[in-house]
Amino acid sequence: MLVSCTHIRIKNILGFLRFLFYNFRSFQQLKKSSGLIQKSFHSTSLFDLWTLSAWESKKAMLAYINNGAHLDAMKNFRGIADTFKSKVVRWETEVFPTWDEAIRRNNESDYEYEKSAYAKLSKE
């Protein structure tokens, strides 16, 4: 399975309210997504939010990410999060990871939001 772990560092209280709006809509989309194996949400503080999802394939994951409410959320990401402290990491695994493992992998990643395809979406 393909696992995706996203850390979202919320900018401020307005960003948190925006996150709640987009997260609700994205979660509704996620529940209907084909190829989703498992999902989880975690917060280490009011401004440090985490999502973890496992997918049958990259194609299934991209179908969710690049459409509907999730795409709208990505286009509005700069109004929600600190783009220099938010990141996503993906890897293949046989077992859905623990939060400790997911956070460790995310923290060890050299991913830079500002150089990602997501940054282009939020500038459109």
Each model region followed by its residue ranges:
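Short S/T/G/P-rich N-terminal loop/turn motif that feeds into the first structured element of a domain
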Residues: 1-48, 62-63, 84-124
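An amphipathic, aromatic/His-enriched active-site/gating alpha helix that lines ligand/cofactor pockets
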Residues: 58-87
